[in-house]
């Protein structure tokens, strides 16, 4: 398994832990543990990337891995990072970590909120590590569903309207 796949595996383990968690303390414990692991992994990745670059590695994508999923259509799970994606992974991990604590006192449907928040993080992290168009689009679509629900259920103001606008904006033709 490639190191980059950890950024998808940790949120998947968080989902399993949240699914089994009973009580608010267990839910918060799973979220803090997972968010901390993501933040640590992103800091480690940043230092690994900077170490590779300072050692003279000039490859376009570092830590690349390709796994063929469906041969007739040449669909594969292709991941790798460049400088921008490393920075975006680090920023996303910081946002997941701080978002966990910002939602600390959320009471209605706490478990469901954190399940969708974690599902969103799978899509975001997967999007930033993907280097194949199919993989990128798959993770982008994974992120859209939780984003719609997080805005529509836990948002404020005209949340239903805004969630529809946010989801339909990338596909709207003008």
What are the roles of these predicted feature ranges?
Residues 11-15, 96-97, 119-124:
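Hydrophobic, membrane-inserted alpha-helices
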Residues 169-174:
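Short "domain-exit" segments at the C-terminal end of structured domains
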Residues 8, 79-80, 93, 129, ...:
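Short conserved micro-motifs on helix faces and helix-strand junctions that flank
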